[in-house]
Amino acid sequence: MSKVIGIDLGTTNSCVAVMDGKDVRVIENAEGARTTPSQVAFTESGERLVGQPAKRQAVTNPENTLFAIKRLIGRRYSDPTVEKDKGLVPYRIVKGDNGDAWVQTRDEKYAPSQLSAFILQKMKETAEAHLGEPVTQAVITVPAYFNDSQRQATKDAGKIAGLEVLRIINEPTAAALAYGMDKKNTGTIAVFDLGGGTFDVSVLEIGDGVFEVKSTNGDTFLGGEDFDARIIDYLASEFKKEQGIDLRTDRLALQRLKEAAEKAKIELSSSMQTEVNLPFITADQAGPKHLNIKLTRAKLEALVDDLVQRTVEPCRKALADAGIKASEIDEVILVGGMTRMPKVQQVVKDFFGREPHKGVNPDEVVAMGAAIQGGVLKGDVKDVLLLDVTPLSLGIETLGGVFTRLIDRNTTIPTRKSQTFSTAEDSQTAVTIRVFQGEREMAADNKMLGQFDLVGLPSAPRGVPQIEVTFDIDANGIVNVSAKDKATGKEQAIRIQASGGLSDNDIERMVKEAELNAEADRKRKEAVEARNHADGLIHATEKNLKEYGDKIPAEDKAKVEGDLTALKAVLDSEDAESIKAKTDALMQSAMKLGEAAYSAGQSAEGAPHAAGAEASAQSRTDDGVVDADFEEVDEKKGH
């Protein structure tokens, strides 16, 4: 039975884990790292890079290196946060055909779900390489404060990546699961999760294998990216004061500033001062300009103070919704890379009145929790029950544009709730049900999830028809809504798909594209491996030709030279089969050279060493396995 993997699809980095017996193992990627940058890049040659290779070339290809895509997922192009994001990133955010925020790179437009799928594919491949078997099922985490559109878009990303998403689980809940699995103690914990792009705080009660979320709150547009933006802004302003040049208008310089800002931020978590040094950042008529600015921890804390303080109000609301005081929290768990910042830790300590727990790895704990939930769903992990909540209230628009709640925030899910409504006008034969999610009193101020019509109502005075509206939230936090006319039994139901969102046809097309790309990637990898092998053979053959070419018949030498030229001609192609065929041909013809080299070695070293020469030749060809000389020892001696 194949394993279920747990994936933390992060704004800045992603991580994958799997249950290994009773333990959870975080899986290293092909580059040997336990986390993978959530970045996708498209090169000039049309190659797609994901993870570390994408991040490495970002400075030279800023417009086509896409990062922090999670902040766009499930959002409309008209969303104010998208407008804000457009000023922070060097790539182009455009309006998708469905009205959602998409990304334009080179000549293609991509949905955030599609780009997230490329990252999920990388995590899937990482797990498959480690496990040695195909992986088809996953539990994927999302910020607790993600709305329905964002959850649905994340699930779509999993499908495009070729994964059956068994469950969408909230990040703080996953972290609590990983933290509390081995602990026998019971109590109330708060999970403070400040990552690369989002902030969540959840209050949970843990006891006897039951993890019950009491409340959750957060901000889906607050994280490390915002801290980086403040540093970038400061560096650019200081440079403009000194040199009169605004680096913010130069995409290449902006990307270098971003890398430097991230590095400085990390360094200032452990040191009091750092120096940002970027030679040749720009140039004018007078020549090249260099950026060299000292940044202290105190200055950084002043720059981001309001961002750190923004985490306090959600904490206050989460405690109020849970009906407890800060002093009643037994443990505060820090999750997300930004919680390494001393200022953040101090604010947490001041608010909760206790030192936060630092015993979990903030970058890996969420993926570990997702893997545990995968084990629970598979039946491999027993006696664990997870009770999560819906982060935002759900309801419909009623007369006067009022938002009428059917399900309040922090209601345990899965849940189902019905309420009866009526018509607003005489002889009304159809009603439009408009579904919203949020906490404001007027529907228009909340997030509209979708709408549908219930038609064919019998003509009657206003207030007479009885229309029952039912909300159903599944364990993923995804909403289904139905409306039924009690008199006729007519019913209309929808799985909420935001007025934007991807249609089934879109998803199907993207799944096919992903499969085609996977095949293209496999062929590209085969070509690279074939090229590497051919390169080594060309080098060895040319060396042997110089040394031993005159020791073989002229026609054999001509054959080797011909095959060598033929292999060089196809070396730069992407046709792995052609490279392999020409490599095999050269290997065959070059055997004569090998024999000449062997004979020369034999005559030079003398017959007694011939066997040794053969052994050494053998040791070099057997896939890098080195044969060692050994001496047989008579065990009876010396005992």
From Swiss-Prot:
Induction, as annotated: By stress conditions e.g. heat shock.
PROSITE patterns the UniProt entry points to: HSP70_1, HSP70_2, HSP70_3
Ranges for region Disordered: 597-639
Keywords, ordered alphabetically: ATP-binding, Chaperone, Nucleotide-binding, Phosphoprotein, Stress response
Entry-annotated residues carrying Phosphothreonine: 198
Acidic residues bias: start-end ranges: 624-633
Keyword Cell membrane: no
CDD domains: ASKHA_NBD_HSP70_HSPA9
Database matches in InterPro entries: ATPase_NBD (IPR043129), Chaperone_DnaK (IPR012725), Heat_shock_70_CS (IPR018181), HSP70_C_sf (IPR029048), HSP70_peptide-bd_sf (IPR029047), Hsp_70_fam (IPR013126)
GO MF term list: ATP binding; ATP-dependent protein folding chaperone; unfolded protein binding
SUPFAM superfamilies: Actin-like ATPase domain (SSF53067), Heat shock protein 70kD (HSP70), C-terminal subdomain (SSF100934), Heat shock protein 70kD (HSP70), peptide-binding domain (SSF100920)
Record field: compositional bias (Low complexity): 603-617
Keyword set includes ATP-binding: yes
Family matches, as Pfam families: HSP70
PANTHER family listed in its UniProt record: HEAT SHOCK PROTEIN 70KDA (PTHR19375)
HAMAP family in alphabetical order: DnaK (MF_00332)
Protein function: Acts as a chaperone.
Family: Belongs to the heat shock protein 70 family.
The protein's name in its UniProt record: Chaperone protein DnaK
Species per Swiss-Prot/TrEMBL record: Rhodospirillum rubrum (strain ATCC 11170 / ATH 1.1.1 / DSM 467 / LMG 4362 / NCIMB 8255 / S1)
Organism placement in taxonomy: Bacteria, Pseudomonadati, Pseudomonadota, Alphaproteobacteria, Rhodospirillales
